[in-house]
Amino acid sequence: MSDKFTVEIITPNKTILKAETNEVTIPSYEGQMGILKDHIPLITFLRPGIISLQDQEKKYYVEEGTVEFSNNNLLILTSTARSLADLNHSSIEDLISIAESQLSDNNSSDKEKYKLSYKISTLKEINQ
């Protein structure tokens, strides 16, 4: 009997990943969540952070989105998803700079500032 389940990461432009895995860690506003096979059904919101597939050592930077787990299928719908292997120091610095300028914009709502602060801290963590 396999301990694997299906995970899909989908952006508006394309499917980033469709794979079988043993465990996925996702960033949510409730904290980091570990998903294993036969997890209870779940719907939650993504915060900017890192999605990790433990058995494949794959990691993806994601921004906001939704997560649904049902019948051993994990569906991650996100505005942005990038493999950490594809991000370099310069591109991360550019993303941080853009987010910091958006954060300093006085027209941003508190909710938007909250999301941007998560994004900036995650990008800085990746960039170390």
Residue map of PLM features:
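Compact, glycine-rich, soluble single-domain proteins
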Residues: 6-98
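Acidic/glycine-rich phosphate/pyrophosphate-binding loops and surrounding catalytic core
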Residues: 85-128
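N-terminal export/targeting signal detector
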Residues: 1-4
